[in-house]
């Protein structure tokens, strides 16, 4: 689907109804290099600007640079959006977007029966299936009969959309996350304007990359309109929340602020000792910024040293904390 850089979305020839939902949950899943964290973050930002309350849950592979297409290398980003205040991610997904068979295998169990499953059909070749440990193609085996499956050749369509930019094949393929984002933004009645503006600001020093990502985004949006693959669009109305200034906060940031508050309220100085490991490293980085409150942070050489220094500090009379994640535990 061809789309100029600043073109308006094409008009739908069929009146596709808008279904109003109180809440919805979406997950983007693919290889750790497929940009799923970025895709989820941008859809979250768009949903916030639309007035929804939003809660997110990113998931990273524990392995360092797991082979592409394998189960160990799957990265995903969950978000739940609601017209009411929301406190936790949903137990089951309304929509699952998968970029390859490994992402499908690792995440399908979390999609509700009758949920929408958007699949990059270009990545279901024999070698892709083998790496994901599939003995037969799930697109043909009947395994997906309980879901509303939408197969889209995302890779091919992305390359076609960005062809005019002259990007290499590798760089062109990397834009496919924005194609999938365009599809989902159409599905949930979202404007592309904020995402376009963000792309152009983020890649202002690389105009060809900015143009390619915008083209892919618009192409995904247009594709969802023209192919009539979806029976309805879904609108989650704005949440009714008290007026005021709101901010985005991660669990790690909230935990860090909680540590500062606990230290101040208890009258005890705080020591946080840990070995860096994603995503727990953010706590160490965050607490290091609050040394004006008398906090001390230690970047230990390993997890055993982090635990030992925390235990020793606790015996020494301070409020001692350590943290880790995944294989560190």
List where the protein language model places each region.
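Active-site cofactor/cluster-binding pocket
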Residues: 2-266
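Non-catalytic terminal/interface segments that mediate subunit docking, oligomerization
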Residues: 14, 28, 38, 239-311, ...
């Amino acid at each position: 689907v061809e789309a100029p850089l600043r073109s308006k979305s094409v008009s739908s020839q069929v009146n596709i109804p808008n279904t109003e939902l109180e809440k919805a949950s979406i997950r983007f899943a693919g290889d750790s290099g497929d940009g799923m964290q970025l895709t989820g973050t941008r859809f979250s930002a768009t949903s916030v600007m639309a007035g929804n309350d939003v809660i997110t849950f990113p998931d990273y592979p524990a392995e360092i640079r797991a082979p592409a297409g394998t189960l160990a290398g799957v990265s995903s980003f969950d978000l739940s959006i609601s017209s009411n205040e929301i406190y936790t991610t949903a137990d089951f997904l309304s929509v699952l977007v998968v970029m390859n068979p490994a992402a499908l295998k690792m995440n399908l169990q979390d999609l509700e029966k009758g949920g929408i499953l958007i699949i990059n059909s270009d990545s279901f070749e024999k070698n892709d299936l083998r790496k994901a440990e599939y003995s037969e193609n799930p697109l043909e085996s009947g395994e997906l009969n309980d879901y509303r499956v939408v197969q889209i050749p995302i890779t091919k369509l992305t390359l076609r959309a960005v062809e005019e930019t002259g990007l290499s094949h590798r760089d062109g393929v990397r834009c496919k996350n924005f194609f999938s984002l365009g599809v989902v933004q159409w599905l949930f009645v979202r404007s592309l304007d904020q995402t376009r503006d963000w792309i152009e600001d983020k890649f202002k020093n690389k105009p060809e990359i900015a143009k390619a990502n915008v083209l892919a985004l618009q192409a995904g949006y247009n594709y969802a309109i023209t192919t009539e693959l979806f029976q309805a669009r879904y609108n989650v109305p704005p949440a009714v929340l008290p007026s005021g200034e709101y901010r985005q906060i991660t669990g790690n940031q909230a935990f860090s602020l909680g540590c500062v508050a606990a230290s101040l309220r208890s009258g005890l100085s705080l020591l946080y000792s840990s070995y860096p490991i994603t995503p727990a490293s953010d706590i160490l980085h965050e607490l290091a910024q609050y040394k004006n409150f008398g906090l001390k942070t230690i970047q230990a050489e390993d997890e055993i040293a982090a635990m030992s220094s925390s235990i020793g500090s606790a015996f020494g009379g301070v409020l001692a904390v350590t943290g880790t994640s995944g294989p560190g535990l």
